[in-house]
UniProtKB/Swiss-Prot annotation:
Protein name per its UniProtKB record: Protein FlbE
Lineage of the organism: Bacteria, Pseudomonadati, Pseudomonadota, Alphaproteobacteria, Caulobacterales
GO BP terms, alphabetized: bacterial-type flagellum organization
Origin: domain of life: Bacteria
Key words, A-Z: Bacterial flagellum biogenesis
Length: 212
């Protein structure tokens, strides 16, 4: 026996209380004219094109967003590299400067103390005596250099250079009773390095932009 699929009864027509037709289900059209078929095909094609265009635009927008994200990451990396380059360049310049300063102090160890006397000329001009402490090997050389500078600036007081074994080469202390001055090449170099490191740390990654 062949099983015939049972079709559920559908209430296609609804009557009102007076026996009139209140609702009739629309009949499904089973045949179409060639014009209707072509119109349906054209509509389906247009809807398909619109759907494909929307998908393409969405994919393009997503691709652009990914490109923008990649560029942003690249800029961050470049900024970090540039900061490291600036830091390395600054430290290299500092090291070169230290080498040059060391060489200059080796050849002219009395230069800092004579420069100090010239800078303090007005402050010490009325002092009767200035005591200067320097490293033992520079005592005589410093005494002669300071006397020459004193004659040039018109200082009439007495300058006394004394040897101090605790003083590094080119280091000195000035003592004129009312005041005191001192210079230590190593300490000065350390302060410069610390100031440079602090400036680099404060700058961080907020320096001038790489691209404008």
């Amino acid at each position: 026996m062949t099983d015939i699929p049972h079709r559920k009864f559908a209430f296609d027509t609804v009557f009102d209380d007076h026996g009139g037709v209140a609702y009739t289900a629309p009949r499904v059209k089973k045949s179409f004219t060639p014009e209707e078929v072509e119109a349906a095909k054209a509509q389906a094609y247009a809807e398909g094109e619109r759907s494909a265009l929307v998908r393409t635009e969405q994919e393009a927008a997503q691709a652009l967003a990914e490109v923008a994200h990649a560029v942003q990451q690249a800029f961050g990396t470049l900024a970090h590299v540039a900061h490291e380059h600036r830091e390395g360049s600054a430290m290299l310049a500092l090291a070169c400067g230290r080498k040059i300063a060391d060489a200059a102090l080796t050849h002219f160890p009395e230069a800092p103390v004579t420069a100090a006397l010239e800078a303090l000329a007005r402050e010490v001009e009325a002092q009767p005596r200035i005591f200067v402490r320097v490293s033992p090997e520079l005592e005589e050389r410093t005494q002669q250099a300071l006397e020459n500078v004193a004659a040039q600036i018109g200082f009439q007081g007495q300058i006394v250079a004394r040897a101090d074994g605790a003083m590094a080469p080119a280091a000195f202390t000035f003592d004129w009773g009312d005041g005191r001055a001192a210079f230590d090449p190593d300490g000065a170099a350390q302060r410069v390095a610390e100031a440079l490191e602090a400036a680099i740390a404060a700058e961080g990654l907020h320096a001038e932009p790489l691209f404008t």
